[in-house]
C-alpha cells in the first residue's frame, strides 16, 4: 500500500510539473502539434489543451492570435486553419 501511495504522489508531481504536457494539456502553442493551438478550457482559463485549428463552418474567435502564439490564449477556440478567415455569422463567428 505504501508503494502505491508513492506512485500516486510521483504521478501527481509529474502531472503538475512546469512544462509537463500530458494528454494534450499545454501552456503555449509550441507544446502542441501541427494544426493545433493551446486554447483555454471552457471551464477554467487556468487550464489549457491542444485543440485543432478551426475548419470550414466551425465556430471561431475573431480576435484570436495567429499560430504559433507565444503568450497564453484566453479563448477556448483556436484560429481558423490556413486559407480560412473568421467571419461574423449571425451572433457567432465561423471559419470560412
UniProtKB/Swiss-Prot annotation:
<feature type="signal peptide">
    <location>
        <begin position="1"/>
        <end position="19"/>
    </location>
</feature>
<keyword id="KW-1015">Disulfide bond</keyword>
<protein>
    <recommendedName>
        <fullName>Prokineticin Bm8-d</fullName>
    </recommendedName>
</protein>
<feature type="disulfide bond">
    <location>
        <begin position="60"/>
        <end position="86"/>
    </location>
</feature>
<dbReference type="GO" id="GO:0005576">
    <property type="term" value="C:extracellular region"/>
</dbReference>
<comment type="similarity">
    <text>Belongs to the AVIT (prokineticin) family.</text>
</comment>
<dbReference type="GO" id="GO:0090729">
    <property type="term" value="F:toxin activity"/>
</dbReference>
<keyword id="KW-1213">G-protein coupled receptor impairing toxin</keyword>
<feature type="disulfide bond">
    <location>
        <begin position="32"/>
        <end position="50"/>
    </location>
</feature>
<feature type="disulfide bond">
    <location>
        <begin position="26"/>
        <end position="38"/>
    </location>
</feature>
<keyword id="KW-0800">Toxin</keyword>
<feature type="disulfide bond">
    <location>
        <begin position="37"/>
        <end position="78"/>
    </location>
</feature>
<keyword id="KW-0964">Secreted</keyword>
<keyword id="KW-0732">Signal</keyword>
<dbReference type="InterPro" id="IPR009523">
    <property type="entry name" value="Prokineticin"/>
</dbReference>
<feature type="disulfide bond">
    <location>
        <begin position="80"/>
        <end position="95"/>
    </location>
</feature>
<dbReference type="Pfam" id="PF06607">
    <property type="entry name" value="Prokineticin"/>
</dbReference>
<dbReference type="GO" id="GO:0001935">
    <property type="term" value="P:endothelial cell proliferation"/>
</dbReference>
<dbReference type="InterPro" id="IPR023569">
    <property type="entry name" value="Prokineticin_domain"/>
</dbReference>
<comment type="function">
    <text>Potent agonist for both PKR1/PROKR1 and PKR2/PROKR2, and inducer of a potent and long-lasting hyperalgesia. Also potentiates capsaicin-induced TRPV1 current, when tested on DRG neurons. At subnanomolar concentrations, this protein both induces potent chemotaxis of macrophages and stimulates LPS-induced production of the pro-inflammatory cytokines IL-1 and IL-12. In vivo, potently stimulates the contraction of the guinea-pig gastrointestinal (GI) smooth muscle (nanomolar concentration).</text>
</comment>
